[in-house]
Every structure is written in structure tokens, then in C-alpha cells.
């Protein structure tokens, strides 16, 4: 185990912004890394003028020497040189960086054409053990529920709808014994639970919230308006839009008969 831990500490994320885009620039940087015996694990562009690399080396001194040499280069500007975070690994893997709210660091923004990146991001969160409360905002039919299910599959987790409108309106009021497994991903539709759920259903939601497992709440703003929970209880908030200028509103949730009018039928297990 010591060897594995040691190797993990010697992975680094290196990202730079191109100042002078000339032929052979990437080759020069690769040669520099080679001379310092630093291996390139993965490389990708993460923006029009930025490139990211996942590096691996044996000693911290190699990174210190690299850093000092990079400071003398006028053709690039180092933007990140650090132990890799989840967002760094995904940036290299997908070729784009996950947008993060400048004021609220636990809020991450995605667009519909980034569903692959979103699924990968959530799958990595789902793999982590213990309690996690994730909220996901977005307009109807933008792909919220489908992304949660796909992420569960990628993380080899079983997903369980506590409340949902994916196919037909589902409102659970009890679970069977094995459904309480902390290996499950529990999916709650904040609008369905608070607008249509019985007291038995809401009690079940409270039980699930206490489990050391992953819970994903769609429409978290409506959920916290009508329960004892607050947005501070959420570990991550994800926003999914059709386009960057789309405003996420809840006007569609104001009609009390909205699901009946849409042709949904309700199940209570």
C-alpha cells in the first residue's frame, strides 16, 4: 500500500496558456519533460489556447526543477502545476474544463452538449463512499434524470427512484430491506416529493437523507423551500442548461395539476 500511496503523490497536473503559438512548441515542452525524466500520462487541449497534461515522476525535486525552468519561458504562461484534482483529470480526459461558479465553489455548470463530461463527473462523485447530497438544477427535458442514471451505470451503482417523472410519476412511501443499501444512488425529484408526496413519503425521504449514501435531488431549490433542509446541506450543486444563456426557472412547477395534465399516472409502492 505504501508504494501505491507514494506513486499517487507523484502525479501532477500541468496546464499552460500559449503566449506565442509557434511550430514545435509542444515538442520543446515534451523534450524538457523527458530530460527531467517526467512522464506524460495524458495530454489534451482544455481551451483554444490552453493545454493540460497529467504528469508522473519519482521525486518532488523534478517538479521543482520543471517549475523553475518554466518561469523563464516567454512562449507559455503556467496556469496550473499541482497535484491533480477531479476537475483536472476530467479536463484532460474530455478536452474541456468544468465551469465552476465564482462565488459558490460547490456549484458546477454544464450545457446539454457536455452530457458526456457531466456523466463522467457525477460517476466519479458516486464512486466515493459515504454521505453525499447532490442537487441538480435544470429545465424540463434537459437530461437531468437520464444523466443521473447513466452516471450510476458508469459508477457500477444501482439507482433507485424515490420520486420521479422519468416514465410515470413515481412516489415511494416505503422501501424493502435491500433497497436501503448504502451502495445505491437515491434519486429524489424535489418538485414531486414536496408538491405531491404524502407524509409517509416525506418520512421516507428523511430516512434516506440520514443514510451514509449518495442522494441526488432534482430541483433542489423547490426541495429546500418546502422541507427542513437548506442549500448548505448540499455537497455539490450541478446546473444543466440547453445553452449558456438559458435561465433556470420554476414557472413550470407552479401549476398544482401539472402532472395530471401531462398524462402522468402515479404509483405509490
Curated annotation (Swiss-Prot):
It comes from Bacillus subtilis (strain 168). It comes from the Bacteria. PROSITE patterns: ACT. InterPro entries: ACT-like_dom_sf, ACT_dom, DUF3388, UCP021288_ACT. It holds the Pfam family DUF3388. The lineage of its organism: Bacteria, Bacillati, Bacillota, Bacilli, Bacillales. This is Uncharacterized protein YmfK. The gene is ymfK. Residues 14-89 form the ACT domain.
